[in-house]
């Protein structure tokens, strides 16, 4: 992994009791060695693979001002991290989920992009076997389950200050509270809505097919082309590029997809991250509720699966063998 560490600061928040969250500040930056590099690579990999929300700094953000000063005037990164940890403690202490942890400020470069990653990492206990085959307790940072993490794309922030996506953060296992906490700490607002962008793309695809008066098979072929491209981008960690996507879709009318979507006012960005759950709707129907969970290929609607809108009834012709086997065994058991 081509990841170059510039500087890392570690501090700690310690929960003394239900009302007290103390700060333990390190007096020097963390030296970069093999163990530190491995930790940052793992943190970068785990964070990059998770679903993130996008944001931007509010005008007058204290953290943004401090970071800007730190970078423009070449101020002490350690001092910046120490002051920011104090603000982090003040915000985190407002929430009942505050448990403390190791606070990491990592400035690094990856593929010519400069980042600042801020994370609160929990420590966990585990067991290990030593050379004498004795069991010892060891402590480790639980990076895989980290959910209090934010990352600033410093390159994007400084070269394109009008961007709505240079700041990202995780939603977290406790939902909106973690999002609120990071918004308060960073003094930021939510920016690019990736789900809305993906939903807009799906609507544009459906309207594009309808405008060209395509039949069912032709529509599904276009949806499959869109899904294949978007899924490839998702797997590669790349964003959906509308211009590239338009080239992947075989022309079906007088206008190509890019021209059509631009003229119809879907307000799609030139590029945006793919959302796996939303894109799945291109090829599948899925839903759950009331004790029922179901998903099926979109091509089956109208062939083996029929929906009566008036009665809200789905009729399935030909059940999957494993489901049919369970139903038969339950029926036979009931008849004995």
UniProtKB/Swiss-Prot annotation:
Listed PANTHER family: NUCLEOID-ASSOCIATED PROTEIN YEJK (PTHR38772:SF1), PTHR38772
Name of the protein this chain belongs to: Nucleoid-associated protein Spro_3255
Cytoplasm among keywords: yes
NCBIfam families tied to this protein: PRK00378.1
Keyword DNA-binding: no
Source taxonomy: Bacteria, Pseudomonadati, Pseudomonadota, Gammaproteobacteria, Enterobacterales
GO cellular component: bacterial nucleoid; cytoplasm
InterPro entries reported in the protein's UniProt record: Nucleoid_associated_NdpA
């Amino acid at each position: 992994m081509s990841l170059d560490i510039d500087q890392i600061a570690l501090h700690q928040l310690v929960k003394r009791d239900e009302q007290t969250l103390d700060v333990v500040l390190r007096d020097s930056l963390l030296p970069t060695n093999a163990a530190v590099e491995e930790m940052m690579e793992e943190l970068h990999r785990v964070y990059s693979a998770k679903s993130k929300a996008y944001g931007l700094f509010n005008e007058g953000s204290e953290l943004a001002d401090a970071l800007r000063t730190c970078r423009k005037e070449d101020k002490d990164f350690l001092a910046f991290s120490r002051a920011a940890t104090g603000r982090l403690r003040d915000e985190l202490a407002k929430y009942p989920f505050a448990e403390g942890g190791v606070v990491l400020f990592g400035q690094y470069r990856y593929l010519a992009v400069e980042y600042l990653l801020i994370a609160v990492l929990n420590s966990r206990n585990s067991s290990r076997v030593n050379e004498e085959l004795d069991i010892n307790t060891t402590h480790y940072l639980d990076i895989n389950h980290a959910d209090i993490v934010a990352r600033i794309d410093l390159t994007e922030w400084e070269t394109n200050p009008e961007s709505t996506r240079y700041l990202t953060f995780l939603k977290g296992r406790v939902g909106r509270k973690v999002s609120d906490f990071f918004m308060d700490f960073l003094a930021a607002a939510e920016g690019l809505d990736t789900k809305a962008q993906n939903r807009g793309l799906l609507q544009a695809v459906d309207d594009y097919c309808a405008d060209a008066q395509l039949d069912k098979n032709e529509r599904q072929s276009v949806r499959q082309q869109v899904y294949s491209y978007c899924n490839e981008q998702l797997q590669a960690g790349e964003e959906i590029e509308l211009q590239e996507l338009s080239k992947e879709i075989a022309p079906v009318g007088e206008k190509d997809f890019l021209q059509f979507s631009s003229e119809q006012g879907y307000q799609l960005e030139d590029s945006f991250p793919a959302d796996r759950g939303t894109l799945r709707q291109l090829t599948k129907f899925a839903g759950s509720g009331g004790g029922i969970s179901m998903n099926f290929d979109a091509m089956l609607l109208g062939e083996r699966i029929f929906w009566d809108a008036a009665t809200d009834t789905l009729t399935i012709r030909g059940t999957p063998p494993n489901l049919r086997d369970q139903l038969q065994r339950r029926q036979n058991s009931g008849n004995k």
